[in-house]
Amino acid sequence: MKYFAAFLPMRDLEKSQELRPGHIAFLDQMSQEGKIFARGRFVDGAGGLIIYIAESLEEARKVAKSDPYVAGGARSLELHEWDMKIVS
């Protein structure tokens, strides 16, 4: 499995607030399915970041585009494969 960093820059704050319950439900479901490594918002309100776990960029993009924030136009999507290194 590979890791993919999904940056979700804010496009529409009002839409984000409306879509938040669906976004949280989506994150919970994807987490239960083992498709999310980490997630969180940017403290400055600029958006958020989700680290997806997937076999390919195409698979990660399909999942990321199904996020209500992205599908609803509240957030943009910038997706990159992430070569994670754990520093001890």
Predicted regions and their residues:
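Conserved, structured core segments of small domains
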Residues: 1-88
